[in-house]
């Protein structure tokens, strides 16, 4: 399968383990299970393990106890990043005609419990989500996609980090047209984007003069809805609107896994000539 072949390619020359025996369940099997589990809506490590233990144990005879599976999966976070990069390159998402950038919240706990929460205490912060018109405590994901909906990159910061400051991490490897919302308006940020070869297009605020033609503004508004769809899928199907992880290691694995699974779904749709973001239809195709 693709995972097995790509896994061998991206890990060529890399020694994943310095000692001990090879695991009974192969690393490529673990990643395959994670991706399938995520697409089916089983977003947590335990839920994915339980699903395959209950329904597909004969297909994965090496599947052992839950803690072993969770630890092995978390240790493969870097490999999953390399696999995601492989998909991005394969579909030409970095060199696409245009990209869209936006952020969304990842709650660590309910706002009322924030003072007592010890989960990701050094990384979390208080933030405001304009789309939901609510304050929250946790993290913020800054997502970049191409115009088809392929997730090119993501970076996660504390909720109180300005999205313009975080955007540099995901914009550094692309050029051309980038669509953003009003939150990305800042003269210095605009100038930095131009220096990187990026044409940043955003709506204007009420006190700003608009010189672009109306048809262009309507087109930008319509195209920007693509990232709203992707974020909605990540929040609902992949449950990325909150996290139950207690450390950066497992958080990194969780975010990477969900992004990889989503991108794999889009990749499959593109290969089948289907609507890229129709993940529901992919499951019954």
Where does each model-flagged region fall?
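Short alpha-helical elements
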Residues: 1-285
